[in-house]
Amino acid sequence: AHTIFLTMNDRGLSLNSAEMMKAYIIQQISESDRLDVNHQWQENINRIKNASSYDTSGVVSTEDVEFISTWLRAKYAQTLREGKLGAKDEDFELLGEKFHTWVRANARSVMGLAKSKDFRTLIMTEMTKVTNLYLRIKEYGKKLTPGYEEVFYNANRDLNYQMMLIIAAVCNDDTEE
């Protein structure tokens, strides 16, 4: 019953990795900060979902999962599966669709999340900064913008790792520009 509770929402639908990661992070945060962190998480995710193309097919948007996977891969993946048959999945692959499991296993050792304030900073500072950057890069990829022409050209040539590489290069204390 506990497993079902952790993996299904109040409508009986399965939770995605983003929702399960959020639940884990919120559990690690002090009671006094939970509402603020939850609000910031929701604001970031809503901005990501609202910026994605509108889909009327009835298919559930996975933009939040794609965003978090890109963010975590850019910032925390240290290993990559070898290119041989039967090779074991490493950080990069594990941070794909099931990143919530990787975060639980590596929060302290790889991500440096030991205390409530660390988890709070992850959402309030890092996730928010990456959300802002992600949305800007998406916009620059759609519209030719002076000073960001390369981003536009790369996006329109489907250079898939551009977003991840840009996010990897940015630190929490960098300016917006």
Predicted features along the sequence, with ranges:
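Polyanionic (Asp/Glu-rich) segments that form extended negatively charged tracts
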Residues: 1-177
